C-alpha cells in the first residue's frame, strides 16, 4: 500500500481550547471565530492573492488529537448524531476516528489581516494543523439534490 506525506501549511488559532467544547459541525456555531496563520513559504501574500473575493473556504486539516495507532483499524464508529449507541461504517460518518486523520470544514472568511485569514463558523481546535485551503464554489459545492438520511 502506498504511503503519502503532507506538508502542514499553517495552524489554526481558535476560540476552542478543548476538543469536547467544539460543535459537531461548523454551521452550528456561526459566531465561533479563529485565525489561520501560515508557515513559510505559504505566509507569502502571493499564496492568498484572490481570496479577498471569496466568502467561504474549505479547510483540510489533521485531527491531531485522534491520531490512529499504526495497527489500529476502526471499520465502525458510534456517531454522536445517532446518540452514541448505534454503530455505522466509518465512511458513512464524519467521525474523527478515521483511517487517515483528515478533516474537512467549510468556514466563512471574515477577512485577511497581516497575511492571516480571519475565519468564522469554525469547528476547529486551537492548534489544529492545516494541510490545504480551497475556495468554496457555490455552484459546484452546494448540491440541492443531495440526500443523507442519517444527518
Where are these regions (language model features)?
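Glycine-rich, low-complexity intrinsically disordered segments
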Residues: 1-106, 110-151
Amino acid at each position: 500500500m502506498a504511503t503519502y506525506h503532507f506538508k502542514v501549511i499553517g495552524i489554526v488559532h481558535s476560540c476552542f481550547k478543548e476538543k469536547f467544547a467544539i460543535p459537531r459541525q461548523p454551521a452550528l456555531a456561526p459566531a465561533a471565530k479563529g485565525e489561520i496563520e501560515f508557515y513559510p513559504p505559504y505566509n507569502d501574500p502571493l499564496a492568498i492573492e484572490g481570496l479577498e473575493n471569496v466568502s467561504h473556504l474549505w479547510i483540510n486539516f489533521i485531527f491531531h488529537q485522534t491520531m490512529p495507532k499504526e495497527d489500529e483499524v476502526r471499520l465502525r464508529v458510534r456517531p454522536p448524531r445517532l446518540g452514541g449507541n448505534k454503530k455505522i461504517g466509518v465512511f458513512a460518518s464524519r467521525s474523527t476516528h478515521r483511517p487517515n486523520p483528515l478533516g474537512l470544514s467549510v468556514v466563512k472568511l471574515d477577512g485577511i489581516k497581516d497575511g492571516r485569514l480571519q475565519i468564522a463558523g469554525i469547528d476547529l481546535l486551537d492548534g489544529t494543523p492545516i494541510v490545504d485551503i480551497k475556495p468554496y464554489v457555490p455552484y459546484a459545492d452546494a448540491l440541492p439534490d443531495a440526500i443523507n438520511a442519517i444527518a
